[in-house]
Amino acid sequence: MKRRFTPHRLSHRDGLVRQIDLFFETIWSETPEQLSPIDPDEWLAHYARRRYGAESSAAREAFRVLRTTVYNPSLNHNGEGAPESVVNARPAFEIRSASSWGTAVIGYDKHEFERAVQLLLEDYDTLRQSDGYLFDLADCLKQVLSNTAQEYHNTMVQAYRKKNLAVFDDYSTRFFRLIGLTEQVLGTRREFLLGTWLRGARELAEGTDDFTHDLYEFNARALITTWGSLRQANEGGLRDYSNKQWAGLTHDFYRPRWEKWVALRRAELTGEAKDRRSEMEQAEDWFRMEWKWVLGRSPYPAEVNGLDLKELAQQALAFSF
């Protein structure tokens, strides 16, 4: 199997299949003079068994589907990683990405990707003892929800432009329910907890005074949101550079921005108000809202929520557009 690069198609650099494992095996499995092609489907079938510690024909088929959707290298032409979630972006009518240099383009069949998730669920009771399996399932679920969020956002925008308040209300309600479910899915993994990141920052300041602890947390909050002050965030385009899909950040940072945007659009549809701010004024208002969170010190858990991923998966798939 020839590769010019390794594809990353799950939400923002959180990979499910360890592409590097395959990449290294392609290079170093034999001497350079004796390199032979690797059958990716056969390799993935063995990888699924090694990763999950149990045999599952459904998991093998799921990996095959993932290879032809999110891990299809021919679909990755953007060079800036995986598609970014609209939930993580500053709210707008047209969203091309969350970060300035990313993309929100999803080039694969979303429903085919969901089929891979359904396949992963088939042997849930057998595979649930595998931490790798639970990570992969959570990782895929947040991508399912991210894909559906994009469809909900598009429908909200269309309803607004057609001045259809009923449809706008319907899909904005669905959108926020989806964000809530995303928060729950993320909360099942320590890797996806804001609290893990903030605790790590404060631990780096161990042995120093309270000011230094707070400074480290301030920097940790800024790095994953505004990156810096107004100039860096807006003029420099660095806001939402990392746009992490993390529990805590999703509920307390991304969701309030969308609540504000939806409230403004609804007020326009009902004739209660008109948003007359310039684009620059809107950007400055977003920054002020974001900066308030950066300066905050609200605690976030660094332990998982203990929710059942199978139940969350069924809810996530039911959201499918």
Which functions belong to the PLM regions below?
Residues 1-321:
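Substrate-binding groove of N-acetylhexosamine-processing glycoside hydrolases
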